[in-house]
């Protein structure tokens, strides 16, 4: 049950704890979390997976596409408002899925990696994003018309099934031959309507919608089975160490820290000094220069993909952004779109001094010429707001909830979103320059409100469409943001005037 009070709309600007109970009625030991468009996943230390939120395409993997709640809520939207265990089919019988080591949620679909390197997917399958190939059959209700308005009679899968890859000589996808089940996978990421996986030999495969080149196999066609990503010369892309799938684009960090991207580039989000979409892995450059090797972005450790914005973290801790920059959402206080990676400048250049961060508060100097954008903070950053005004003068104290510290960036809608996991005692907020009206990022340390000498650690955080899921170092899961589809997992979606269910 939640341990904090929610806002009266049913959404919350402060973190609420999600109750995830195991078979023995003890709290499950959660080690990883993931967030899709309107659903969430949580992985336990024993390899099981829990899910909650929107379930109209079976993206929760529980064997149904209906509405369930501890309060027996019945309505038009299929959802689970509290966590449920993801199921598996074993000899035709439903059992709890097990031995999972990696999870990802994207759009209305989910993907899991088992310890033996096999991949299981479920949810919406209309563009091949589940990677079933010719093995997709109509059973367990994946075309069951729970409501024509909900599934539009499109294929979906309510129980995890194993994904397949196509033969390597079938890169054109014409009359493709299914080869084998996908194997030796170490990492998987589900995008909006496509998925990308990393094999233990450094090769990258993808499946699903490919009309913008987001599959990276050299063509702009969709596929219902995994195909191998190639580089700009048509050779198999190799030496990848991590991968990421976005809205209509994909990315991979190669050994040595080089960043490669492919897919939609209409907003310059590929960072290759152009606005032309790419169907093969293309290296990201710095600024507008591609004349020398030193002009390529290097030493990248983490990459995060939004709709039209890309953010990368360097080994030295610097943050690099590129893509659309409406109102300065790339964090550099200008209104210029970058076709190559641009480093977010030092915050003290703009006279913002956060040296006196303590006790969970940040004090902004009274002579600062900035205002805090509270619209962004209200739904994502979890601030303890003083009133409902859109903007507040920068001077004075601002409180952080103790569950919120992280490094984040701003997406195309001006919303704060995280860029990587494992961040310790850091939070990023947006501020608005009163002289130009452009927004930028400010990073500050955050300490425990009850112990001003102790920083707070959150090892993992994930953002959905307009909500956030955080895993604290003690294994507890906290959520905040929009809760219209039960994606916060707290047992209800609406509150009465007293803030109670």
Predicted regions and their residues:
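Conserved core positions of repeat-based scaffolds
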Residues: 39-42, 51, 109-112, 121-122, ...
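An edge-strand/N-cap motif at the start of beta-rich repeat modules
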Residues: 1-8, 15-18, 28-33, 311, ...
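Solvent-exposed, low-complexity, repeat-rich "mucin-like" stalks and linkers
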Residues: 350-394
């Amino acid at each position: 049950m939640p341990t904090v009070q929610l806002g009266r709309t049913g959404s919350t600007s402060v973190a609420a704890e999600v109750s995830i109970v195991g078979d023995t009625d003890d709290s499950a030991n959660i080690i990883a979390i993931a967030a899709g468009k309107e659903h969430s996943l949580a992985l336990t230390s024993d390899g099981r997976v829990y899910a909650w939120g929107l379930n109209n395409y079976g993206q929760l993997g529980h064997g149904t596409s209906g509405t369930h709640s501890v309060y027996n809520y019945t309505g038009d939207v299929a959802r689970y408002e509290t966590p449920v265990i993801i199921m598996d089919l074993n000899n035709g019988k439903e059992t709890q899925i097990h031995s999972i080591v990696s999870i990802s949620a994207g759009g209305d679909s989910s993907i899991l990696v088992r310890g033996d390197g096999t991949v299981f997917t479920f949810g919406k399958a209309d563009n091949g994003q589940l990677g079933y190939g010719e093995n997709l059959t109509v059973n367990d209700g994946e075309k069951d018309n729970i409501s024509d308005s909900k599934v539009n009679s499109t294929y979906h899968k309510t129980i995890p099934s194993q994904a397949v890859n196509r033969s390597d000589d079938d890169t054109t996808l014409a009359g493709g031959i299914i080869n084998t089940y996908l194997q030796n996978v170490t990492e998987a990421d589900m995008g909006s309507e496509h998925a990308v996986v990393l094999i233990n030999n450094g090769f990258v495969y993808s499946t699903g919608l490919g009309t913008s080149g987001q599959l990276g196999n050299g063509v702009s066609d969709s596929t219902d089975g995994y195909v191998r990503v190639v580089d700009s010369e048509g050779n198999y892309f190799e030496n990848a160490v991590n991968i990421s799938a976005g809205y209509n684009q994909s990315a991979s960090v190669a050994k040595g820290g080089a960043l490669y991207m492919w897919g939609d580039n209409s907003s310059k989000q590929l960072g290759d000094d152009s606005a032309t979409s790419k169907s093969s892995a293309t290296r990201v450059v710095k600024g507008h220069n591609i004349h020398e090797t030193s002009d390529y972005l290097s030493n990248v450790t983490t990459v995060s993909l939004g709709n039209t914005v890309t953010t990368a973290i360097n080994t030295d801790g610097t943050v690099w952004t590129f893509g659309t920059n409406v109102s300065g959402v790339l964090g550099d206080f200008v209104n210029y779109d970058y076709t190559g990676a641009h480093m977010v400048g030092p915050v003290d250049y703009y006279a913002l001094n956060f040296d006196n961060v303590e006790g969970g508060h940040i004090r902004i100097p009274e002579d600062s010429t900035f205002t805090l954008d509270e619209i962004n903070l209200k739904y994502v950053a979890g601030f303890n707001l003083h009133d409902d005004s859109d903007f507040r003068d920068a001077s004075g104290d601002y409180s952080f909830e103790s569950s919120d510290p992280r490094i984040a960036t701003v997406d195309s809608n001006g919303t704060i979103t995280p860029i990587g996991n494992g961040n310790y005692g850091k939070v990023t907020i947006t501020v608005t320059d009163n002289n130009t009206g452009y927004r930028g990022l400010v990073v500050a340390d955050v300490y425990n409100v009850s112990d001003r000498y102790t920083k707070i650690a959150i090892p993992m955080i994930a953002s959905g469409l307009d909500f956030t899921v955080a895993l604290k170092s003690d294994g507890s899961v906290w959520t905040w943001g929009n809760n219209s589809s039960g994606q916060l997992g707290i047992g209800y979606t609406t509150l009465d005037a007293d803030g109670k269910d």
